Amino acid sequence: RALQKAANCSLGARIHVEKRIPVGAGMGGGSSDAAGVLVGLNRLWETGLTRAELEDVGLTLGADVPFCIRGGLTRTRGIGEAMQELPCGQCFPLVVIQPCGGLSTRDVFAAYHAQAVSFRPDNDAAQAALADGDLRALSPALGNVLQPVSEQMRPAIADAIADLRNCGAAASLMTGSGSAVFGAFETEQSADAAFAALKKRYDRVFRCETCMESVIEQI
């Protein structure tokens, strides 16, 4: 309906969304679904909205939707609407684990705001490391201010991050508000080996890689 209103369009559609991103994982599954539907309907209905216009519509649905429409690597400010596109030296092999049940984003943020959290990641250093494709330099610059809060709610998150590092991940962190965590590896072979080992310990383990394409380019 948001797209119908923005494009002054009365057409409809029967939509089936096959979800592959785990629910309650902090990976933007719902936001990416919304982005894909907006882009698909814009093409199906031939409404002709630009990417920027689709991002504006997406922002009315969720803070992460504009990024999911744009894709690639961005440095994001505000609630998600101010995006600076960044160069990336390479795509990284990943192993993603959802070690426990999902977390409520609202509950995590409520607990975060109730605490005094002074830690901040070094975004400038992370940006430089990503531009160089240097995972070893990236690792100490990474941080997720929500991670300590989510680990208190689900201690298995910290265990999974440790398991990824023990399996050779050059960088490992919680995604979003949790409960999923990822490990970035320097080679496909090391990621494959970690994936094989971790499948024996966890039910929900995924082998993937970073992607520099947007939803618009994939559909």
Language-model-detected regions and their locations in the chain:
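Phosphate-handling active-site elements
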Residues: K5-R14, V39-T60, T187-K200
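Short pre-catalytic strand/loop immediately N-terminal to key active-site residues, enriched for Gly-Thr
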Residues: A13-G26, G168-S172
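N-terminal pre-core extensions flanking Radical SAM catalytic domains
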Residues: M174-E186
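DPxDG-like acidic metal-binding loop motif
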Residues: A25-R51, F67
